[in-house]
C-alpha cells in the first residue's frame, strides 16, 4: 500500500488529502492461479458442484491469503466457474468461515449462480449445521436478533440494538447433551457473517474451540470451532428438482463426541 507514492508503516495515520494506492495489492489478489489442492467433491454436474470443505481452508483469496484457498482449488479441479463475483470469487455463492467445515455449493455458470443466490435470499435453500457447544442446552428454540460489526472489536460480529444491524434468524434443536456440553443442530434462516457463532455465544452456549467467541479454554486440543455444515438442500438450477446432500462429521469432531460419551 502506497500513500502519496511512498511506502508507509501499518500504523501510519491518514491525513486529509492523502492519496492511497492499492494497485499492487489488487494485482496480487487478481494474479491468483489454479492450484493442485485436493478437495472433497461430493457432487458435480454442468451447473453446480457441492464441496465438503475442510477445516482451516479459507474460501477465497484476500489480503494475506492469496494462495491455498478453496477458490484456488476449484480453479484447478473444476472445468468451469461462474463469473458473477469476478475473478477473486469465481463460483462462490455463499461462504463458510475458515475453521468451519462442511458442505458448500458452487456455481459453475452464471445462470446457476443467479438461481442459487435467489434461493439463499428467498430462504428456500436449507442449510443445517451441527456444533458442540458449552453447557447443557435444555430445549429447542430460535433466535432472531440484529447482527453487525462489534463496535469494540472490528474482527468480531455482535448482537446489536434494533435498527443498528441486519436481521439474523437461527433455529436450533438439541441432539444430545452431556454433563457440560451439548450437541446442537442449527438451521440458518439468514446468512449473516459468523451468525451461528454469534448466536450460540449470545445464548451463553459458545461453540467449543471457537477462539473468537468462546472465552473458555478448550480442553480438546482443537484447531478451531466444532461447527460443521452437515446438510444442504437446494433446487437444481436447471432440472428444478429438490436435491439434498449430507456429509459425515470430521474425524476430530467424532473424536470429541467419543471422549464425551466415555467420560464419567
State the predicted function of each range:
Residues 1-264:
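RNA pseudouridine synthases
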